[in-house]
Structures are given as structure tokens and as C-alpha cells.
């Protein structure tokens, strides 16, 4: 129901069911042919009535398999960095870093989906929603939910991922709009290497 409200708020109806094959082609290309991905983003959190609760912006890097970095450039600041083995969460305002084993820390989450993805048909129920304006929408619902989110929708313009919408268990919607997208260009390993700043508290469950 919440997604239905969001679609109504966004405007026109969806394209016919004949677009299903085209939708899978877009998804397969993104997960199988895109090895690196970089973009700037604006993230907006909406409540169940589609009222904006919070807006942040930042930069995103992905290098498959398993590496990603989200840097939030808000006044509070936060970085989420995964190097394939360790996940770092840095809260600038709290001056605190959390260090955890990546495999156990993030489970089945959008970050795992976007930075891996080859198993998406095995792990997710996929629905091709079709075109709305210039954006082609695809829904992925985890087959085994761990409670972190209920549904993720990916919006493509042409073959390029431009929008991510996430519905959590509290019926809040997180909408991420991507810009300045760059695919399949080398990303330095240093982007995914995190060194805690001097003086911050480090909480770790990794040897």
C-alpha cells in the first residue's frame, strides 16, 4: 500500500507487461556487466504519509565483488566503508568508529545487493514494474528478510541506475537520487581503505 501511494504521488501509470524481458536485461546488465560504479547522491527519508523527514547528500563508490563506500556530507557526517572483509562505520558527530566483520555485519541489505548482486534471482523475488516517465522501475523483495528492509526498487534511465527506493519495516521510504554516474572506470583501492582518525573511539568485534 505504501508503494502504491508513492507511485500515485509520482504521477503516471506503468508500462505494459510486455516490458518484462527488457526489465530483466537492464537488471542483468547492471549486476553482471558493471564492475565499478561511482555517483553523487541526494537521500531523502519519507514517512508513511510521504512527508520528508530528513535529507542528506554525499558520494557513493562500488567495486564488485563486495566493496563499497558511502560518504554522507551532511553537517553531522558519516562514512560507511566495506573492503570485502571488514565494515567500518564512522560517525563524525559522535567521534566514534565501529569495526565489524563484513559478512556478519550487513547480512542481506541493499548494500550487499548493489555491491554483489550476481545472486539476486536466488535471493530476491523480482517484479518488473515498467516505465514511469523516463525511469524504468524494478522491484526486489528479499525471500528471507532479516528485518532491515521490506523492498527495494531500482530505477533506470536507459541502462544506467539513477534512483533507489527502499521501504523499511516501519513503512518509511528512503529515496536515493543518483547523479554524475560513472561506470566501469578504475577506483583506487584507497577509497575502500579506512583508517580511524586520531582521537576517535573505536568499537571492534574483529580480531
Predicted regions, residues:
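Flexible, processing/modification-adjacent segments and terminal tails
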Residues: 22-47, 51-53, 81, 90-150, ...
